Regions:
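Conserved AAA+ ATPase small/helical "lid" subdomain
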Residues: 237-309
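C-terminal engagement/docking regions of AAA+ P-loop ATPases
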Residues: 302-361
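Intrinsic-disorder-associated interaction segments
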Residues: 6-10, 248, 252-255, 259, ...
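Non-catalytic, well-ordered alpha-helical scaffold segments
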Residues: 61, 65, 139, 165, ...
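Amphipathic alpha-helical interaction segments
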Residues: 74, 101, 128, 218, ...
Length: 361
Protein backbone atom coordinates (compact mmCIF):
# COMPACT_ATOMS: atom_id res chain seq x y z
CA UNK A 1 0.00 0.00 0.00
CA UNK A 2 1.26 3.48 -0.90
CA UNK A 3 2.39 5.73 1.95
CA UNK A 4 1.04 8.81 0.17
CA UNK A 5 -1.76 10.46 2.10
CA UNK A 6 -3.86 11.00 -1.01
CA UNK A 7 -3.46 9.35 -4.39
CA UNK A 8 -4.53 10.88 -7.68
CA UNK A 9 -7.50 9.39 -9.53
CA UNK A 10 -5.25 7.66 -12.08
CA UNK A 11 -3.21 6.12 -9.26
CA UNK A 12 -6.19 5.04 -7.15
CA UNK A 13 -7.98 3.40 -10.08
CA UNK A 14 -4.97 2.33 -12.14
CA UNK A 15 -6.20 -1.26 -12.57
CA UNK A 16 -9.60 -0.10 -13.81
CA UNK A 17 -8.04 2.28 -16.33
CA UNK A 18 -5.68 -0.42 -17.60
CA UNK A 19 -8.59 -2.84 -18.03
CA UNK A 20 -10.64 -0.25 -19.89
CA UNK A 21 -7.75 0.60 -22.23
CA UNK A 22 -7.25 -3.10 -22.95
CA UNK A 23 -10.93 -3.77 -23.71
CA UNK A 24 -11.69 -0.48 -25.48
CA UNK A 25 -12.42 -1.11 -29.17
CA UNK A 26 -14.39 2.07 -29.89
CA UNK A 27 -12.84 4.99 -31.81
CA UNK A 28 -10.95 7.50 -29.65
CA UNK A 29 -10.74 11.25 -30.25
CA UNK A 30 -7.20 12.34 -31.02
CA UNK A 31 -5.19 12.73 -27.81
CA UNK A 32 -7.59 10.64 -25.70
CA UNK A 33 -6.54 7.50 -23.81
CA UNK A 34 -10.09 6.10 -23.87
CA UNK A 35 -13.08 6.33 -26.17
CA UNK A 36 -16.09 8.39 -25.00
CA UNK A 37 -18.00 5.17 -24.21
CA UNK A 38 -15.12 3.85 -22.10
CA UNK A 39 -14.85 7.19 -20.27
CA UNK A 40 -18.57 6.93 -19.48
CA UNK A 41 -18.08 3.38 -18.15
CA UNK A 42 -15.21 4.57 -15.96
CA UNK A 43 -17.26 7.42 -14.49
CA UNK A 44 -20.65 5.69 -14.15
CA UNK A 45 -19.49 2.11 -13.56
CA UNK A 46 -19.82 -1.13 -15.49
CA UNK A 47 -17.53 -3.89 -16.75
CA UNK A 48 -14.25 -4.00 -18.66
CA UNK A 49 -13.86 -7.65 -19.55
CA UNK A 50 -13.85 -9.48 -16.22
CA UNK A 51 -12.98 -6.32 -14.28
CA UNK A 52 -15.72 -4.54 -12.34
CA UNK A 53 -15.62 -0.77 -12.76
CA UNK A 54 -16.99 0.99 -9.68
CA UNK A 55 -19.06 4.13 -10.31
CA UNK A 56 -17.21 7.37 -9.54
CA UNK A 57 -20.35 9.48 -9.92
CA UNK A 58 -23.78 8.32 -8.80
CA UNK A 59 -26.47 10.42 -10.40
CA UNK A 60 -27.93 11.38 -13.76
CA UNK A 61 -25.93 9.51 -16.41
CA UNK A 62 -27.05 11.96 -19.09
CA UNK A 63 -25.14 14.77 -17.36
CA UNK A 64 -21.92 12.77 -17.67
CA UNK A 65 -22.62 12.10 -21.35
CA UNK A 66 -23.01 15.86 -21.88
CA UNK A 67 -19.70 16.50 -20.08
CA UNK A 68 -17.85 13.98 -22.23
CA UNK A 69 -19.46 15.21 -25.45
CA UNK A 70 -18.43 18.79 -24.60
CA UNK A 71 -14.79 17.76 -24.20
CA UNK A 72 -14.84 16.06 -27.62
CA UNK A 73 -15.53 19.47 -29.17
CA UNK A 74 -13.34 22.55 -28.86
CA UNK A 75 -15.48 23.88 -26.00
CA UNK A 76 -14.29 24.07 -22.42
CA UNK A 77 -16.45 22.53 -19.67
CA UNK A 78 -17.73 24.37 -16.59
CA UNK A 79 -19.11 22.26 -13.74
CA UNK A 80 -21.29 24.28 -11.37
CA UNK A 81 -23.49 23.43 -8.43
CA UNK A 82 -23.84 23.60 -4.67
CA UNK A 83 -20.72 22.91 -2.59
CA UNK A 84 -20.21 19.18 -2.06
CA UNK A 85 -21.85 18.03 -5.32
CA UNK A 86 -18.67 16.30 -6.58
CA UNK A 87 -17.56 18.98 -9.05
CA UNK A 88 -13.84 18.65 -8.26
CA UNK A 89 -14.17 14.87 -7.91
CA UNK A 90 -15.78 14.60 -11.35
CA UNK A 91 -13.30 16.96 -13.02
CA UNK A 92 -10.39 14.94 -11.63
CA UNK A 93 -11.81 11.65 -12.87
CA UNK A 94 -12.68 13.05 -16.30
CA UNK A 95 -9.09 14.26 -16.68
CA UNK A 96 -7.73 10.91 -15.46
CA UNK A 97 -9.87 8.88 -17.87
CA UNK A 98 -9.33 11.11 -20.91
CA UNK A 99 -5.67 12.11 -20.52
CA UNK A 100 -4.35 9.67 -17.93
CA UNK A 101 -3.19 12.69 -15.92
CA UNK A 102 -5.29 14.74 -13.48
CA UNK A 103 -2.36 16.63 -11.96
CA UNK A 104 -2.43 19.64 -14.29
CA UNK A 105 -4.55 21.86 -12.08
CA UNK A 106 -4.87 25.53 -11.12
CA UNK A 107 -6.49 26.33 -7.77
CA UNK A 108 -8.36 29.59 -8.20
CA UNK A 109 -8.16 32.18 -5.43
CA UNK A 110 -7.97 35.93 -4.93
CA UNK A 111 -4.19 35.53 -5.15
CA UNK A 112 -4.13 33.68 -8.48
CA UNK A 113 -2.19 35.68 -11.08
CA UNK A 114 -2.20 35.74 -14.87
CA UNK A 115 1.32 34.27 -14.82
CA UNK A 116 -0.05 31.14 -13.14
CA UNK A 117 -2.38 30.69 -16.11
CA UNK A 118 0.08 31.52 -18.91
CA UNK A 119 3.76 31.29 -17.93
CA UNK A 120 6.34 32.90 -15.66
CA UNK A 121 10.12 32.99 -15.41
CA UNK A 122 12.89 31.54 -13.31
CA UNK A 123 14.29 34.95 -12.44
CA UNK A 124 17.77 33.72 -11.48
CA UNK A 125 18.17 32.14 -14.93
CA UNK A 126 16.50 35.13 -16.59
CA UNK A 127 18.98 37.57 -15.03
CA UNK A 128 22.01 35.42 -15.80
CA UNK A 129 21.18 34.40 -19.36
CA UNK A 130 18.19 36.39 -20.55
CA UNK A 131 14.91 34.93 -21.85
CA UNK A 132 15.22 31.29 -22.89
CA UNK A 133 13.15 28.11 -22.93
CA UNK A 134 15.19 26.90 -19.96
CA UNK A 135 14.20 29.98 -17.95
CA UNK A 136 10.52 29.67 -18.91
CA UNK A 137 8.25 28.28 -16.17
CA UNK A 138 5.26 26.71 -17.88
CA UNK A 139 1.82 26.90 -16.29
CA UNK A 140 -0.48 23.86 -16.13
CA UNK A 141 -2.45 25.38 -19.04
CA UNK A 142 0.74 25.75 -21.09
CA UNK A 143 1.74 22.15 -20.37
CA UNK A 144 -1.73 20.87 -21.27
CA UNK A 145 -1.74 22.78 -24.58
CA UNK A 146 1.76 21.52 -25.34
CA UNK A 147 0.91 17.87 -24.65
CA UNK A 148 -2.70 17.85 -25.88
CA UNK A 149 -4.25 16.93 -22.53
CA UNK A 150 -6.82 18.10 -19.99
CA UNK A 151 -6.20 20.89 -17.50
CA UNK A 152 -8.39 21.59 -14.46
CA UNK A 153 -9.25 25.03 -13.09
CA UNK A 154 -10.79 24.86 -9.61
CA UNK A 155 -12.96 27.66 -8.21
CA UNK A 156 -12.63 29.91 -11.25
CA UNK A 157 -14.99 32.51 -9.74
CA UNK A 158 -12.56 33.15 -6.88
CA UNK A 159 -10.12 34.74 -9.32
CA UNK A 160 -9.99 38.48 -9.98
CA UNK A 161 -11.59 39.76 -13.22
CA UNK A 162 -8.26 40.44 -14.95
CA UNK A 163 -7.19 36.85 -14.27
CA UNK A 164 -10.49 35.49 -15.58
CA UNK A 165 -10.06 37.68 -18.67
CA UNK A 166 -6.75 35.96 -19.44
CA UNK A 167 -8.72 32.75 -19.95
CA UNK A 168 -10.89 34.31 -22.66
CA UNK A 169 -8.12 34.61 -25.25
CA UNK A 170 -6.66 31.22 -24.32
CA UNK A 171 -10.00 29.47 -24.81
CA UNK A 172 -10.79 31.41 -27.98
CA UNK A 173 -7.45 31.21 -29.76
CA UNK A 174 -6.21 27.93 -28.25
CA UNK A 175 -2.61 29.17 -28.17
CA UNK A 176 -0.14 30.93 -25.88
CA UNK A 177 2.22 33.60 -27.19
CA UNK A 178 5.60 34.19 -25.56
CA UNK A 179 6.73 37.51 -27.10
CA UNK A 180 10.01 37.48 -25.15
CA UNK A 181 11.04 34.39 -27.14
CA UNK A 182 9.12 35.19 -30.31
CA UNK A 183 7.17 31.92 -30.16
CA UNK A 184 3.49 31.14 -30.53
CA UNK A 185 2.58 27.80 -28.96
CA UNK A 186 -0.67 26.30 -30.38
CA UNK A 187 -2.74 23.79 -28.44
CA UNK A 188 -2.36 20.19 -29.59
CA UNK A 189 -5.49 18.14 -30.26
CA UNK A 190 -6.72 16.60 -27.02
CA UNK A 191 -6.39 19.84 -25.08
CA UNK A 192 -9.38 21.13 -23.16
CA UNK A 193 -10.13 22.83 -19.87
CA UNK A 194 -12.46 21.68 -17.09
CA UNK A 195 -13.42 24.43 -14.66
CA UNK A 196 -15.51 24.33 -11.47
CA UNK A 197 -17.53 27.03 -9.71
CA UNK A 198 -19.91 27.06 -6.74
CA UNK A 199 -23.42 28.44 -7.11
CA UNK A 200 -23.85 29.05 -3.36
CA UNK A 201 -20.42 30.52 -2.62
CA UNK A 202 -19.82 32.65 -5.69
CA UNK A 203 -16.36 33.71 -4.61
CA UNK A 204 -14.64 37.01 -5.30
CA UNK A 205 -16.13 37.83 -8.71
CA UNK A 206 -18.80 36.29 -10.88
CA UNK A 207 -17.73 35.21 -14.35
CA UNK A 208 -18.16 37.73 -17.16
CA UNK A 209 -20.63 36.99 -19.94
CA UNK A 210 -17.72 36.81 -22.39
CA UNK A 211 -16.01 34.09 -20.36
CA UNK A 212 -19.23 32.15 -19.82
CA UNK A 213 -19.70 31.98 -23.59
CA UNK A 214 -16.43 30.04 -23.86
CA UNK A 215 -17.82 27.24 -21.70
CA UNK A 216 -20.50 24.62 -21.92
CA UNK A 217 -22.05 24.70 -18.45
CA UNK A 218 -23.28 21.59 -16.63
CA UNK A 219 -25.04 21.99 -13.27
CA UNK A 220 -24.44 19.08 -10.90
CA UNK A 221 -27.46 18.69 -8.58
CA UNK A 222 -27.54 17.48 -5.00
CA UNK A 223 -28.56 13.79 -4.66
CA UNK A 224 -32.24 13.49 -5.55
CA UNK A 225 -33.27 11.18 -2.68
CA UNK A 226 -31.96 9.72 0.55
CA UNK A 227 -31.16 6.32 -0.96
CA UNK A 228 -28.95 7.86 -3.66
CA UNK A 229 -27.16 10.01 -1.10
CA UNK A 230 -26.61 7.02 1.19
CA UNK A 231 -25.16 5.04 -1.70
CA UNK A 232 -22.70 7.86 -2.47
CA UNK A 233 -21.72 8.24 1.19
CA UNK A 234 -21.29 4.50 1.80
CA UNK A 235 -19.09 4.09 -1.26
CA UNK A 236 -16.87 7.07 -0.52
CA UNK A 237 -16.50 6.31 3.20
CA UNK A 238 -15.50 2.77 2.25
CA UNK A 239 -12.86 4.07 -0.16
CA UNK A 240 -11.44 6.50 2.39
CA UNK A 241 -11.37 3.98 5.23
CA UNK A 242 -9.32 1.55 3.13
CA UNK A 243 -6.32 3.91 3.31
CA UNK A 244 -6.90 5.55 6.70
CA UNK A 245 -5.89 3.89 9.98
CA UNK A 246 -9.21 4.43 11.75
CA UNK A 247 -9.19 0.96 13.39
CA UNK A 248 -12.96 0.94 13.12
CA UNK A 249 -15.63 -0.95 11.25
CA UNK A 250 -17.59 0.90 8.59
CA UNK A 251 -20.64 2.71 10.01
CA UNK A 252 -23.80 0.64 9.85
CA UNK A 253 -26.84 1.42 7.72
CA UNK A 254 -28.72 2.76 10.75
CA UNK A 255 -26.00 5.29 11.57
CA UNK A 256 -25.57 6.46 7.97
CA UNK A 257 -29.32 6.88 7.54
CA UNK A 258 -29.53 9.04 10.67
CA UNK A 259 -26.76 11.36 9.48
CA UNK A 260 -28.19 11.72 5.97
CA UNK A 261 -31.72 12.23 7.33
CA UNK A 262 -30.55 15.09 9.57
CA UNK A 263 -28.51 16.67 6.78
CA UNK A 264 -31.35 16.48 4.25
CA UNK A 265 -33.98 17.82 6.64
CA UNK A 266 -31.87 20.79 7.72
CA UNK A 267 -30.63 21.43 4.19
CA UNK A 268 -34.10 21.31 2.59
CA UNK A 269 -35.94 23.13 5.38
CA UNK A 270 -38.49 20.38 6.03
CA UNK A 271 -38.74 16.85 7.38
CA UNK A 272 -38.49 13.93 4.97
CA UNK A 273 -42.23 13.26 5.24
CA UNK A 274 -42.92 16.92 4.30
CA UNK A 275 -45.10 17.36 7.39
CA UNK A 276 -43.00 19.86 9.29
CA UNK A 277 -40.95 22.91 8.34
CA UNK A 278 -37.53 23.33 9.95
CA UNK A 279 -35.07 26.22 9.92
CA UNK A 280 -31.90 25.77 7.86
CA UNK A 281 -28.53 26.66 9.40
CA UNK A 282 -25.94 28.87 7.73
CA UNK A 283 -23.77 25.91 6.70
CA UNK A 284 -24.20 23.90 3.50
CA UNK A 285 -24.52 20.41 5.06
CA UNK A 286 -23.37 18.84 1.80
CA UNK A 287 -22.85 15.20 0.94
CA UNK A 288 -19.10 15.81 1.20
CA UNK A 289 -19.55 17.02 4.79
CA UNK A 290 -21.54 13.88 5.64
CA UNK A 291 -18.67 11.76 4.30
CA UNK A 292 -16.17 13.74 6.38
CA UNK A 293 -18.36 13.47 9.50
CA UNK A 294 -18.67 9.68 9.23
CA UNK A 295 -14.96 9.22 8.53
CA UNK A 296 -14.12 11.29 11.61
CA UNK A 297 -16.64 9.28 13.64
CA UNK A 298 -14.81 6.11 12.61
CA UNK A 299 -11.56 7.59 13.93
CA UNK A 300 -13.29 8.45 17.23
CA UNK A 301 -14.77 4.96 17.53
CA UNK A 302 -11.48 3.26 16.67
CA UNK A 303 -9.31 5.37 18.95
CA UNK A 304 -11.54 6.02 21.94
CA UNK A 305 -14.57 3.76 21.59
CA UNK A 306 -15.57 0.19 20.88
CA UNK A 307 -14.41 0.13 17.26
CA UNK A 308 -17.98 0.46 16.00
CA UNK A 309 -19.46 3.87 15.18
CA UNK A 310 -22.13 4.77 17.74
CA UNK A 311 -24.62 7.59 18.25
CA UNK A 312 -22.16 9.24 20.64
CA UNK A 313 -19.48 9.27 17.94
CA UNK A 314 -21.63 11.01 15.35
CA UNK A 315 -23.15 13.49 17.84
CA UNK A 316 -19.95 15.55 18.10
CA UNK A 317 -19.58 15.67 14.34
CA UNK A 318 -23.19 16.72 13.88
CA UNK A 319 -22.84 19.67 16.22
CA UNK A 320 -19.68 20.84 14.45
CA UNK A 321 -21.31 20.49 11.03
CA UNK A 322 -24.48 22.37 11.93
CA UNK A 323 -23.20 25.16 14.20
CA UNK A 324 -21.06 27.49 12.07
CA UNK A 325 -22.56 30.82 13.16
CA UNK A 326 -22.54 30.26 16.91
CA UNK A 327 -25.67 32.02 18.18
CA UNK A 328 -28.05 31.63 15.23
CA UNK A 329 -27.07 28.06 14.33
CA UNK A 330 -27.05 26.94 17.97
CA UNK A 331 -30.67 28.06 18.28
CA UNK A 332 -31.63 26.31 15.02
CA UNK A 333 -29.92 23.10 16.14
CA UNK A 334 -31.62 23.22 19.55
CA UNK A 335 -35.03 23.70 17.94
CA UNK A 336 -34.40 20.81 15.56
CA UNK A 337 -33.39 18.51 18.41
CA UNK A 338 -36.48 19.31 20.49
CA UNK A 339 -39.08 19.71 17.75
CA UNK A 340 -37.98 17.03 15.29
CA UNK A 341 -35.38 14.55 16.53
CA UNK A 342 -36.98 14.11 19.97
CA UNK A 343 -40.23 13.01 18.30
CA UNK A 344 -38.65 10.41 16.00
CA UNK A 345 -39.02 7.57 18.50
CA UNK A 346 -36.91 5.30 20.68
CA UNK A 347 -34.36 4.50 17.96
CA UNK A 348 -33.28 8.13 17.98
CA UNK A 349 -33.34 8.60 21.77
CA UNK A 350 -29.66 7.88 22.38
CA UNK A 351 -28.53 10.25 19.62
CA UNK A 352 -30.88 12.95 20.91
CA UNK A 353 -29.47 12.65 24.45
CA UNK A 354 -25.87 12.72 23.17
CA UNK A 355 -26.53 15.84 21.09
CA UNK A 356 -28.27 17.58 24.00
CA UNK A 357 -25.36 16.85 26.34
CA UNK A 358 -22.90 18.43 23.91
CA UNK A 359 -25.17 21.43 23.37
CA UNK A 360 -25.14 22.19 27.12
CA UNK A 361 -21.34 22.38 27.29
Amino acid sequence: MSKELQLTAEESFEEELRALIKEDKSPKPEGWKLSPKAVLTYICGGKAGAKDIVPKYIGNKRLIEICIATLITDRALLLTGEPGTAKSWLSEHLAAAISGDSKKVIQGSAGTTEEQIRYSWNYAMLLSGGPSMEALVKSPVYKAMESGSMVRFEEVTRCLPEVQDALISLLSEKRISVPELGIDMPAIKGFSLIATANTRDRGVNDMSAALKRRFNMVVLPSPKDIETEMSIVNQRVGQLSSRLDTNSALPGERIVRKVITIFRELRNGQTLDNRQKVKSPSGILSTAEAISLLTNSMALAGSFGSGEVSDEDIAAGLQGAVIKNDEKDRQIWSEYLNNVMKLKGSEWRNLYNSCQELLKD
